[in-house]
A protein has these predicted regions:
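Acceptor/aglycone-binding surface of glycosyltransferases and processive sugar-polymer synthases
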Residues: 78, 84-99, 116-198, 225-235, ...
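Short beta-strand/loop segment that forms part of the nucleotide-sugar
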Residues: 33-49, 82
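A conserved acidic beta->alpha catalytic loop
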Residues: 47-56, 112
């Protein structure tokens, strides 16, 4: 098993949901069966320029470590905080994944829509893959409990079809906010990331395919959580469509990674 795990949680105005989500995460980290997760972990909240008390909430946690993002024992985990100007989820995830510590690096939604007990699935997949993509729509093991509005679900399906045809190929669920990377792959891919909107996941997957990284699709459980600010609006739909078109052009010069760096840490 990989010897350490870094967890990145992007957060924007999550004051109302983050405390309970962190309770859930730390409870699992401390109680997970031996062998399910590495014994060394780091947890990093990236505050994406929140205008509420998100950052203050993180600093008030008993696990908060002012010294930064260092690894600690899983039975006594520490919590780090990185504050960045508001740039959207893609920018926040990128900032965290470029500094987080761990042989395996995972980013997850701050509301724990994918429960922490799914972390072990990504870590195990990264034993043989460079990139592990959580999927909510796999017939063999995922459980998606959605209460999203019908229109949002319809837009999501249309987006998945367009992304598959134009960019991601066999990857159906590009937008699951639960993805894992070996450290070398994370530093490479996030360093090259050009799309910072909600389409950043598609950009990552396209880059991973262009760079020749080994990808695993991992069925995970997922439940829609109240409080999401994501709304399907015409202006957003146009931005998404434009970013999908851009992806294949902004990375035209990207070449395959040397095999020794594609998963050899």
């Amino acid at each position: 098993m990989l010897s350490s795990l870094g967890i990145v949680l992007p957060a924007y105005n999550e004051e109302s949901r983050l405390w309970s989500a962190l309770d859930e995460l730390f409870e699992y980290l401390c109680s997970a069966p031996s062998g399910d997760l590495p014994e060394l972990v780091s947890v990093l909240v990236v505050d994406d320029g929140s205008t509420d008390g998100t950052a203050a909430l993180v600093r008030a946690r008993p696990e908060f470590a002012a010294e930064g993002f260092a690894l600690s024992r899983r039975d006594c985990p520490k919590l780090g905080l990185l504050t960045v100007p508001h740039g959207g989820k893609g920018s926040a995830v990128r900032a965290g994944m470029l500094v987080a510590d761990g042989d395996a690096l995972v980013f997850a939604d701050a509301d724990m829509a994918t429960p922490p007990d799914q972390l072990g699935k990504l870590v195990r997949a990264l034993e043989t893959a460079d990139v592990a993509l959580g999927s909510r729509i796999q017939p063999d093991g995922s459980d998606m409990r959605a209460t999203q509005p019908r229109f949002r679900r319809l837009v999501g399906r249309m987006f998945r079809v367009a992304a598959q045809l134009w960019v991601t190929g066999p990857v159906k669920d590009t937008q699951c906010g639960f993805k894992g990377f070996r450290r070398a792959a994370a530093r490479d891919l996030f360093g090259r990331l050009r799309i910072r909107s909600i389409v950043f996941d598609v950009d990552l997957i396209y880059l991973a395919r262009r760079r020749g990284y080994r990808m695993a699709i991992v069925p995970v459980n997922w439940a829609d959580r109240r409080g999401s600010r994501m709304r399907a609006r015409p202006k957003l739909a146009l931005r998404v469509a434009w970013d999908l078109v851009r992806i294949r052009f902004v990375h035209r010069g990207v070449k395959r990674a040397p095999r020794e760096s594609a998963a050899a840490e």
